[in-house]
A protein has these predicted regions:
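N-terminal Rossmann NAD(P)H-binding glycine-rich loop of SDR-like oxidoreductase domains
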Residues: 3-23
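Conserved Rossmann-fold NAD(P)-dependent oxidoreductase catalytic core, especially the SDR/UDP-sugar
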Residues: 73, 98-140
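Short alpha-helix in the Rossmann-fold core of NAD(P)-dependent oxidoreductases
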Residues: 92-97, 112, 144-145
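NAD(P)-dependent short-chain dehydrogenase/reductase
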Residues: 153-208, 214-219, 223
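C-terminal substrate-binding subdomain of Rossmann-fold SDR/epimerase-dehydratase oxidoreductases
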Residues: 197, 202-204, 209-334
């Protein structure tokens, strides 16, 4: 079996994708990579490479040395961070993808590229956004993702690179902390609910966005990469979703488990503007028809599982509760 390289392996998706791939295939053939290692992370317990995707020679060297046949290219700046650092976002998100596709062209690799609901914009139909529609994003993150979709299509048509991708919604994970995305509230809320029974949300209460629980996202990536290419009509950018929710709806579901949980709102105008430019829901019928996409978690199931898995790891001690009530804020050491 040829190697599987995961770039951005220490990020939100990579932290769960790498172990899943190692369980599904072979530990020694899944190579995790990222810019650096800051602590003993599980991703480094198999093959690991320090890799800067903006440096093409580094990618080529890793691909050659490990005989890589598949690349999951996850390295990117997320939406809110990309707005603060637009030039870096262009260099990392698009320049890094170009370097990966070039390595794939030279070494006949399959490539997975994660696109996003951020690839759409305010002129796109907001409800049941079609698979093929207007894509005029108003953020640098979205611009790099639309460009990435087109670049993958180009390399497939021009050079025969087997590139595949998903337009991912907001992802909810209990493994990795939030990473600078507009949908991060849907992760932060669980930590705060368990710690303080209170959360201040940076998006408005009725901001409706598509979401997916990370286990469903991981299964979907692997399923797409294993699918028969002859069935894939939209190979580089399939719409996928599992639920369309608002902060208020998520809080209400959490309240079924933590009745005293309270939420209030301090809207961040930058992130709210980003969210308002995205679809409220997408049509993922093409993914369901072409390769059998079928998420297992709805809102209720996701909330139940998130709270159970964070559980005792996040619950405060009595001393922490007392400190919190006196205005002392708990800080994670993670």
């Amino acid at each position: 079996m040829r190697g599987i390289l995961v770039t951005g392996a220490l990020g939100q998706i990579g932290s769960e994708l790498v172990p899943a791939l190692r369980d599904h295939y072979c530990v020694d053939r899944v190579i995790a990579s990222d810019l650096c290692v800051t602590q003993a992370q599980p991703e480094t317990k198999g093959p690991y490479e320090n890799l800067d995707c903006t440096q093409p020679h580094q990618i080529l060297e890793v691909v050659r040395r490990h005989d890589v046949g598949t690349i999951y290219h996850l390295a990117a700046l997320l939406s809110a961070t990309a707005e603060k650092r637009p030039l870096a976002a262009w260099d990392i998100n698009l320049g890094g993808l170009y370097n990966v596709l070039e390595a794939a062209r030279q070494h006949r690799c399959q490539v997975f590229f994660p696109s996003t609901i951020g690839a759409f914009g305010p002129s796109t139909p907001r409800y049941q956004t079609p698979q093929v529609t207007i894509q005029r994003p108003t953020t640098m993150y979205g611009v790099t993702k639309v460009s990435g979709e087109l670049l993958c299509d180009y390399y497939a048509a021009r050079f025969g690179v087997d590139s595949r991708g998903l337009r991912l919604p907001g992802l909810i994970s209990y493994v990795a902390p939030p990473g600078g995305g507009t949908t991060d509230y849907a992760v932060e809320i669980f930590y705060q609910a368990l710690r303080y029974m209170h959360y201040t949300c940076f998006l408005g209460p009725n901001t409706r966005l598509d979401m997916m629980y990370m286990p469903d996202a991981i299964r979907s990536m692997v399923a797409l990469m294993e699918a028969d290419i002859a069935t894939l009509r939209h190979r580089s950018a399939y719409n996928v979703t599992a639920m369309s929710i608002t902060p208020e709806e998520l809080a209400a579901e959490i309240r079924k488990h933590i009745p005293k949980f309270a939420i209030d709102y301090q809207v961040d105008p930058v992130r709210q503007a980003i969210a308002d430019s995205w679809p409220c829901s997408v049509d993922d019928s093409a993914a369901r028809e072409d390769w059998g996409f079928a998420p297992q978690f709805n809102l209720a199931g996701m909330v139940t599982d998130m709270l159970a898995r964070l559980g005792e790891r996040q619950r405060p001690t009595k001393g922490e509760i007392d400190s919190s009530s006196r205005g002392v804020r708990w800080q994670s050491t993670a």
